[in-house]
């Protein structure tokens, strides 16, 4: 590929781990890495305004190709001037390929060499998504970073199935590259698959690196495997990817997974976790997970997280948040969502500083102890 709109600049490597401090330059601005990306499934991060996301330090957000294709339609978004104008967001946007949603949401999937036939989860109509169509949709959306169409096999699928799957994903990636109409202003990433099989991850990475994408994603994780299994896959996968290009771990947002991914050389992460759990009153704090809807907080007039300086924690008490959530007030969801997003974005800011100071392992140990990991199993 000759025109590369996405560039990675390495600033510093951490002395004791594979972590790296850098920045990614896109047509809509530059953001620091490692970075957690809030997910705006339907062209909005649930309950958050663009101004709030900018204020908390979100340098890039993610939107979902599958959902925007179905509603309101990628051609409508193109007529609006692209996703940035449509949602009034002037910073970088990443779109996924739609593949994961097809496999996780849609019914009656039929995978062939041409693509995937499935039922629309909204109205049951029959639809078809191919590598070329996934690229066309994302070209219409106009995201800065877009994803190749891939199959995301379950982590514990048999070896023979996963081998056929990654070989097809490589062929789909090549087809997507050929179909890409806007290589001058949209960077297309290849997605490494292979479940937990090292040789298949190696084969997948080799195939994709030979195609010279401007960046690479690691897919097929955070789909039911253990934390240790995820780390093991990252241990043998990230070294296969070029050092001069971004590395994106898809669908990961638990604090320990973010830190451990950074230690293994990952630059970008996304997950719906912070906003999804916030809607149920579950909040991440510096002292671990807290379910603010619980009765014990009915008369707790302290901040949600006394160690956090976000808008929610500076202005509202646990008792008030509990009241809002119990009364089904949208403002309560806004406040808990703001806090959880701020928490992860600020965590990554602190991780970047730890890389600069060459003390990421000490940072990890201190964070894990305070958060409560290991006391009652994993505690996201």
From Swiss-Prot:
Its EC number is 2.4.2.29. Pathway: tRNA modification; tRNA-queuosine biosynthesis. It catalyses: 7-aminomethyl-7-carbaguanine + guanosine(34) in tRNA = 7-aminomethyl-7-carbaguanosine(34) in tRNA + guanine. Its cofactor is Zn(2+). The active site is at residues 96, 270. Substrate binds at residues 96-100, 150, 193, 220. Residues 251-257, 275-279 are annotated as: RNA binding. It comes from the Bacteria. One of its GO terms (biological process) is tRNA-guanine transglycosylation. Keywords: Glycosyltransferase, Metal-binding, Queuosine biosynthesis, Transferase, tRNA processing, Zinc. GO terms for molecular function: metal ion binding; tRNA-guanosine(34) queuine transglycosylase activity. GO terms for cellular component: cytosol. The keyword tRNA processing applies. Zn(2+) binds at residues 308, 310, 313, 339. Binds 1 zinc ion per subunit. Belongs to the queuine tRNA-ribosyltransferase family. Homodimer. Within each dimer, one monomer is responsible for RNA recognition and catalysis, while the other monomer binds to the replacement base PreQ1. Catalyzes the base-exchange of a guanine (G) residue with the queuine precursor 7-aminomethyl-7-deazaguanine (PreQ1) at position 34 (anticodon wobble position) in tRNAs with GU(N) anticodons (tRNA-Asp, -Asn, -His and -Tyr). Catalysis occurs through a double-displacement mechanism. The nucleophile active site attacks the C1' of nucleotide 34 to detach the guanine base from the RNA, forming a covalent enzyme-RNA intermediate. The proton acceptor active site deprotonates the incoming PreQ1, allowing a nucleophilic attack on the C1' of the ribose to form the product. PANTHER family: QUEUINE TRNA-RIBOSYLTRANSFERASE (PTHR46499:SF1). This is Queuine tRNA-ribosyltransferase. It comes from Streptococcus suis (strain 05ZYH33). The lineage of its organism: Bacteria, Bacillati, Bacillota, Bacilli, Lactobacillales. The gene is tgt.
């Amino acid at each position: 590929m000759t025109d590369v709109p996405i560039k990675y600049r390495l600033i510093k490597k951490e002395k004791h781990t594979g972590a790296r401090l850098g920045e990614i330059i896109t047509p809509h601005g530059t953001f620091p890495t490692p970075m957690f990306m809030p997910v705006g499934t339907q062209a909005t991060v649930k309950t958050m305004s663009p101004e709030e996301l900018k204020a908390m330090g979100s340098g890039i957000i993610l939107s979902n190709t599958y959902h925007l294709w179905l509603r309101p339609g990628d051609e409508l978004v193109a007529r609006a001037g692209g996703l940035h104008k449509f949602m009034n967001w002037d910073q970088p946007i990443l779109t996924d390929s739609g593949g994961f949603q097809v496999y996780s949401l849609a019914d009656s999937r039929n995978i062939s060499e041409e693509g995937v036939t499935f039922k629309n989860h909204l109205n049951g109509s029959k639809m078809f998504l191919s590598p070329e169509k996934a690229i066309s949709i994302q070209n219409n959306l106009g995201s800065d970073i877009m994803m190749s169409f891939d199959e995301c096999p379950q982590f514990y699928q048999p070896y023979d199935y996963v081998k056929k799957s990654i070989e097809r994903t490589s062929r789909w990636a090549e087809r997507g590259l050929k179909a890409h109409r806007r290589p001058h202003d949209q960077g297309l990433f290849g997605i490494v698959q292979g479940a937990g099989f090292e040789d298949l991850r190696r084969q997948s990475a080799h195939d994709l690196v030979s195609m010279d994408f401007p960046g690479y994603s690691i897919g097929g994780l955070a789909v039911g495997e253990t934390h240790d299994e995820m780390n093991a896959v990252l241990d043998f996968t990230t070294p296969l990817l070029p050092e001069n290009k971004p590395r994106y771990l898809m669908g990961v947002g638990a604090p320990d997974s973010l830190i451990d991914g950074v230690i293994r050389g990952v630059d970008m992460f996304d997950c719906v976790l912070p906003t999804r759990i916030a809607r149920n009153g579950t909040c991440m704090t510096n002292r671990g997970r807290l379910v603010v809807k619980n009765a014990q907080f009915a008369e707790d007039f302290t901040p949600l997280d006394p160690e956090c300086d976000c808008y929610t924690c500076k202005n509202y008490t646990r008792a008030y948040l509990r009241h809002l959530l119990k009364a089904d007030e949208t403002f309560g969801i806004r406040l808990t969502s703001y806090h959880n997003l701020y928490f992860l974005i600020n965590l990554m800011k602190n991780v970047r500083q730890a890389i600069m100071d060459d003390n990421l392992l000490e940072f990890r140990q201190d964070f894990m102890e305070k958060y409560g990991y290991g006391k009652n199993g994993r505690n996201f």
